[in-house]
Amino acid sequence: MGNGMCSRRQKRIFQALACLAVAIGFVYGAMLNYHLQNDLKKAEAVALKYQQHHESMSAQLQVVYEHRSRLEKSLQKERLEHKKAKEDFLVYKLEAQETLNKGRQDSNNRYNALGVQHEMLKSQHEELRKQHNELQGEHQKLGEDLTRTYSNHKEKYLLLQQEKEQEHSKLKESIYNLREENKQLRKAHQDVHLQLQDVKSQVEEYVQLKKALNKMSSLRQPEKDTVPIGRNNSPTIAPTQEHATEQELMTNVQTRQVVDHDIIIRSSTAANDEAVHLNRVKTNLDKPDEDTVPLPEAEAATEHPVEVEEEHKKELEEEEMEQVGKPERLVEEQDQVQEEQEQHKPEEDDALEGNNEEQKEEETNNMQGNKHTERDPTLKPHSKYKSAYEEQLEQQQLAARQMEEARHLKEQQDLLHQQRLKEHILRQQQLHENDIELQRQNKYKEEQLAEKLRKQAEYENVDHDIVQGEEEQPIQQEEAAYERDNHQDEAEDVDAANNANEEQALDQEAESREGQEKAAAEDVNPADDPNNQGEDEFEEAEQEREENLPDENEAQRQQQEHPEVQEHLAMAGNPDQQEDNIDQQYQEEEEEERQIGAEREPDAQQEENKERNEENYEEEEEEEDGAAGVKNKRRAEM
C-alpha cells in the first residue's frame, strides 16, 4: 500500500511537471510569436516608409526633369523672340527714318517758336540764378545750424554721461557703506545673542539656587516644630537670624536678576537703535533732506525702556518678597503675614490702579505725539512684563519687516533707474531721428536744385547748339558713326559677357548660399538680414548721389558761364548787324536761320537716331537682365 501511494504521488508530480512544462512551452511559443509579429510589423512599417521615400524621390526627379525640359523650351522661345525683336528693330529703324523726314518740316516751324521761347527762358534763367544763390545761402545757413546743433547735442551727451558716471560711483560707495554697516550690525546681533545665552544660563543657575533654598527651608521647618513651647524667646531669635540670612541671599538673587534683566533690556534697546539706524539710512538714500525726522522716535525708544525697567523691578520685588516669607515662618507668623498682606492689598491695588491710569495717560500722549511708536514692541505698555523670548521674537519680526521694506525700496530704486535709462535712450533715438530727417531734407533740397540746374543746362545746351556753326557738323557725324560702331561691338561683347556672367553668378550664388547657411548656424549677420538690405541699398544710393552732386554742380556752373561767352562771341562776330538798318537785319537773320535749319536737319536726324539706338539698346539690356534674373531664380529653385 505504501509503494502504491508513493507511485501515485510520483505520477501526479510527474504529471504536474509535465503540465507545467507544456504550459511554459505554450507561453514561450506565444511570446516568440508575439515578438516575431511585432518585428514583422516594424519591418513592414520601415519597408513602407522606404517605399514612400523612394516614390517621393522618383516623383521629385520627374519634376526636376520636366522643369529642365520646360526651361530649355523657354530658352529656345526667348532666343526666337530675341531674333524677332532684332528684325522688328530694323523695321522700326526704317519707319523712324521716314518719320524723321516728316518731322523735319515740323522742326523748322518749331524753330521759329523756339527763338521766342529762348528769350523768355533767358529771363527765367536769370531769376533762377537769383533763386539758386538764395538757396545756396540758405543751405549754408542750414549746414551751420546743423553743425551747431550736433555740437550742442554732443556736449549735452557728454555732460549726461559724466553725471551718470558720478551718480553710478556715488551709488557704489553708498552700497559699499551699507554693506559694511550690515556686517557691523550682524556682529552686534551675534554679540547680543551670545549675551542672551549667557543670561539664560545664569537664570537657570538662579532657578537651581531657588530650588535649593526652598529645600533648605522645607528641611528647617520640622526642626522648628520640635522646639519646646517654654523656650519661645530663644527660637524666635534664631529664625529671625536665619530669615535675615535668607533674605540677604534672596536680595542678592534679585539684584542679579535685575542686572540680567537690565542686560536683556539694553540688548533690546540696542537692537531697536540698530533698526532705527537702518531706517535712517534707507530714508537718507531716498530723501536726503529729511535727516531730522527719526530723532523723536529714537528718543521715545530710549526713554520708554527706563520706565519699563522701573516697573518691572517693582513687580519683581513685590513677588519675591511674597515668595520669601511664606515657607520659613510658623503657622502663627503666616497668619500674621496674611493679615498684614490683606491690610496692604487694598493700598497696593490703589497704587497699581494709579500707576495704570498714569501709564494710560502717557500712552495717549505718546500716540498723539508720535505715530511711529505703535510699531515698536517696547513702546506698548503692559500690566505684565514680556519675557526675553517674546521680545526676541518681536525684534525678529521687526527685522523681517525692515528687510522687506529695504527690498521694496531697492526694487523701486531699480525701477526708477531703468525708467531713467529708457527715457535717456528714447531721447537719444529721437535726436538721432531728427538728425536723419534734417539730412534727408537737405539731400532732397539738393536733389531739387540739381534737377533745376540740369533743366537749365539742357536749355542752355539748346542755345549753345543754335550758336554753334557748321564747323561742328562733320565732327558730330564722325562721332555718330564711331558711336554706332562702338554700340554694335559693345552689344556683341555684352552678349558674350552676359553668358559668362550668368555662369559666374550661379557659382557665386551657390557659394553664397553655403556661406549664408553656415553663418546662420552660427549667428545672423545684420548685413545679411533681408529687412536691412533695402535700407543699405538706399544709403549706398544716397552716398553715390552725394558724391556725384559736386561734379554735376561744377559742370552746370561751367555751362551757365559758357552761354554768356558764346552770346558775346555771336554778337561780336556780326558787325554788319549793328550798321545795317532794321529791315536788312531781319532779312539777314531769316536767311541765316534758313541756312542753319537746312544744315541742322541731318544733324537732328543723326541725334534722333542716336537717341533711339540708345533707348533700344537700353531696352535690350533690361530685357536681357530680366531674362537672366528669371533664369537665376529658376536655377535657384532647382
Swiss-Prot record:
Membrane topology, Cytoplasmic segments: 1-12
Parts of the chain on the Lumenal side: 34-638
Transmembrane feature ranges: 13-33
Coiled coil ranges: 66-216
Region (Endosome targeting): 80-175
Residue ranges with Acidic residues bias: 348-361, 534-553, 577-593, 616-626
Keyword Transmembrane assigned: yes
Residues covered by region (Disordered): 217-245, 280-415, 455-638
Annotated segments matching region Golgi targeting: 38-107, 176-220
Keyword annotations of the record: Coiled coil, Endosome, Golgi apparatus, Membrane, Signal-anchor, Transmembrane, Transmembrane helix, Transport
One cellular component (GO) term of this entry: Golgi cisterna membrane
Family (UniProt): Belongs to the GOLIM4 family.
Function: May play a role in endosome to Golgi protein trafficking.
Record's protein name: Golgi integral membrane protein 4
Organism from which the protein derives: Xenopus tropicalis (Western clawed frog)
